[in-house]
Structure formats: structure tokens, C-alpha cells
Amino acid sequence: MRFSVIKITLSGLCLLIFVAFVSAQSRHSVKGTADADGTILTVTASRTDNKTEPIKSENLFLYENGIEQKIKNFSYDPSPARIVLLVDNSQTLPTDIEKLKQATMEFAYEIFDGDQLFVVAYDEKPEIIQEWTDDAKKMETSLATFRKKGNPYLFDALNSTVSEILLPLMPGTRKTAVVVIGDGLDRGSKTPFDKILNELQNQNVVVYSLQIPDRTGGAYRRNQPKAREVINQLTEGTGGKIFPLEEASTAAKFICDELRKNRYLLSYFPANTSSYDARRVFIVADEGINIRTKSAQPPNIK
């Protein structure tokens, strides 16, 4: 993932200043729209009681920092999903390349019409293996570049995934997910764990994982969670789920089905809380309804 450098002429500089001004005005307009809509959460909800009636806002109870919030709107999201498969390709990962390929390919067999996959492999640097596609044959060919090398810089890879792959799709695309295929170990990222978790939550990106056993055996990690806890916090913190790598086929079907059939958008105006503070989010539903969302709203501080 590279950043391009552009030489700017004097006339080009004037044009850039004009564009920046127009863009700033546009951002003010977008912000106004967002304020009018309130805060938006992506929510996963499904019935377990065999009832057929739709899930409504009256079935839900939302809290921020323990204070109940009034739900403005709750609606099913039928839009296609954009799923990034983030695959650990580091040297000491306790599995082989063929298993990583097989697990990745399972998603190509399960996505729905309109869904797209993006494959990134990482060691010290994230590497684009396959850009957005729904073509299983194209994806299978691209996976030949998987290898095992170096150390896992998971947090940096997540940061690049959000900033360079997912953010350019927003705000038009709300249904975004990352599937981490690895054990959660990070050895050397410059991006702090808390920072990337906050960014995932702030952008409503849901993290799932096909988890591989921790290669360190649960060893203490200075200034960051243990590998297993990294996976737990990424998934629970964003409203995702964990599956063992050995159940890749089941996991891919579950994740793709869930994103297409059970995703909702919930909007509300936060009351008695400050957007400049981190706010714990807690949502419960009537009996017979399973529901998940992210665990927190990060502070609104740039």
C-alpha cells in the first residue's frame, strides 16, 4: 500500500486551494446531515423464537454509560457487504499456507450477489493480494502469492485496511467488515491497539475472526493485550464473532448470511452524555431476539 507523490505547479496549486475550499463547504453540509440523522449504529439482530414479524425499535433498549437512549429509527439494511479478508502471513504462524488459502476461498463461495471481497496479507507490511472482486477464480489465482515470512504487524495492517481500503467507500457504504485470519499476535506495529480499536468502532466496521491457536501459548505482552485477548476485544468491541480456523466453511456461510440477512441501522440522539467522552454502548432486546453491536462510542476528538 503506497502513497503517491504529486508535483504541483503554481496553477495547480490555485486549483487545489479552490477545491479545498469547496470540499470544506461540502464537509460542513455532510456534517449537518449527520447531525440531523443523529448517531448511527450498525446492529446485528435475529429472531430465535420462530416468530415471523419484523424486529422493531419497540423491541429494543439502548443505553450509553448506563443511561437509556431514545431510539429514533431502526431499519433493515439490505445493501451489499464489503468484506476485507486480513490474513496473517508471518513466519511463525502455527498453520500452513494451504489451510490459509482454503479458509480464504470459503468466502468466495458464500457471498451474495453484490457483495465484494478484498484480500490483504500481512507480515511487517500489509500487501494487497486481491482488490475488490466477487470472482472466485480470480481470487484463487491471486492466493498463490501467500507465503510465510517475517513478524506479524497486525495493528498496522488493520490501520491501513481501514484508512486505505474501507474509508474511501464511506459514507455511501455502511456494511463493512474485516475478517482476521490469524492468532491476534502483533510484534512491532507502530499503531497502538487502543487506537485501531477506537477507529474500527468509530467507523462502524465489524470484525470477525477465524482464530488460530496463540503461537505464544498466552505469553504476557507488554503495552498490549495477549494475542487471544486481542481477537476477543476486536470482535466483541465491534459486534463481531470468533470461529476456529478449522470451521472456516461454517464461519464463511454464517458471516455472509448474517451480513445479508440480519444487519440493521439504528439511529438515536445521545442524551445526557458527551460526545467528547468515551461512551459504553449496551443494547438489549425482548426475549427471543439475539442482538449485537459495538461495545463503545469513542470520543469525538480529532
Where are these regions (language model features)?
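Exposed acidic/Ser/Thr-rich ligand/metal-binding surfaces
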Residues: 105, 113, 123-218, 222-223, ...
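Extended acidic, low-complexity intrinsically disordered regions
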Residues: 25-29, 147, 157-159, 203, ...
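Bacterial N-terminal signal peptides
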Residues: 9-20
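Positively charged n-region of N-terminal signal peptides that target proteins for export
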Residues: 1-8
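Eukaryote-biased intrinsically disordered, low-complexity acidic regions enriched in Ser/Thr/Pro
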Residues: 25-92, 101
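C-terminal "exit" segments of structured domains
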Residues: 32-39, 223, 233, 245-302
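…and closely analogous acidic/polar surface helices at protein-protein or active-site interfaces
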Residues: 74-81, 90-117, 132-138, 158
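Soluble periplasmic/extracytoplasmic beta-strand elements of cell-envelope proteins
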Residues: 39-46, 59-63, 72-73, 82-86, ...
